[in-house]
């Protein structure tokens, strides 16, 4: 497997995480960190994670000091993360904020609760791509396990291909599209379109993604009063 390097900086690098690769080695399969270290000939530090079924932009630090700084940015919610997801179900709402505590359920799954002691927070809006297919643009404000997958399921729109929470397909249609942050007073924005998946390669999706890339797509006005 050859990993794609998206961005290189003296202190960190961004790669494209393919689907089906875990962050850690398991069952004789090398994890993404070791694969990246072998390919690029560097010692790397993990500063955030993506689920095995998720593709997209992933950051690694190149030394311990950068790892501490970037990890702090993630923990302080100072890194803006934008994900793309597809669903064949009509959501309860087309846009909004999904907020609630998460609890472990059966067989490694999670569920969203009505309580808000330590809530997962996800902002989203959605657009119709074609009949029976909807694109969700999501910005998680927290970093809980399975957060976006559980959030969209709670809206009645489980992610296409998510066999844990929805219906099977050729992949789980969740992609880490873009990250934006400031590091040592310099602004960075790194993005990558999804490569894998029949539905992510349809012209209707590609055209919609181009519209998002070319405009100020995020509807800030309806989030001002969210809490």
Indicate where each model-derived feature is located.
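Short histidine-centered loop motifs in beta-beta connectors
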Residues: 136-138
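A short alpha->loop->secondary-structure connector
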Residues: 31-32, 74-81
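Glycine- and acidic-residue-rich catalytic/RNA-contacting loop of pseudouridine synthases
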Residues: 21-33, 69, 86-134, 150, ...
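S4-like RNA-binding module at protein N-termini
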Residues: 1-27, 35-40, 64-65, 71-72
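Glycine/acidic-rich beta-strand-loop module
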Residues: 42-76
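Residue-level signal for inorganic ion chemistry
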Residues: 16-17, 59, 85, 124, ...
């Amino acid at each position: 497997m050859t990993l794609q390097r998206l961005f290189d900086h003296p202190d960190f690098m961004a790669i494209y995480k393919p689907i089906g690769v875990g962050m850690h080695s398991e069952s004789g399969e090398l994890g993404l960190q070791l694969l990246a270290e072998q390919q690029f000939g560097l010692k790397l530090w993990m500063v955030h994670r993506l689920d095995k079924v998720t593709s997209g932009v992933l950051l690694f630090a190149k030394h311990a000091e950068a790892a501490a700084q970037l990890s702090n940015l993630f923990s302080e919610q100072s890194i803006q993360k934008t994900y793309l997801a597809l669903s064949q179900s009509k959501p309860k709402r087309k846009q909004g904020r999904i907020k609630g505590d998460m609890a472990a359920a059966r067989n490694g799954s999670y569920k969203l609760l009505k309580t808000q002691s330590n809530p997962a927070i996800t902002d989203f809006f959605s657009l119709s791509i074609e009949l029976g297919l909807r694109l969700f643009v999501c910005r998680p404000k927290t970093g809980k396990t399975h957060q976006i997958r559980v959030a969209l399921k709670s809206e009645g729109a489980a992610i296409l291909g998510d066999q844990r929470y929805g219906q099977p397909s050729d992949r789980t249609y969740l992609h880490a599209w873009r990250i934006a942050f400031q590091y040592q007073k310099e602004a960075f924005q790194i993005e990558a379109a999804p490569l894998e998946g029949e539905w992510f390669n349809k012209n209707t999706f590609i055209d919609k993604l181009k519209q998002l890339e070319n405009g100020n797509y995020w509807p800030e006005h309806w989030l001002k009063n969210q809490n």
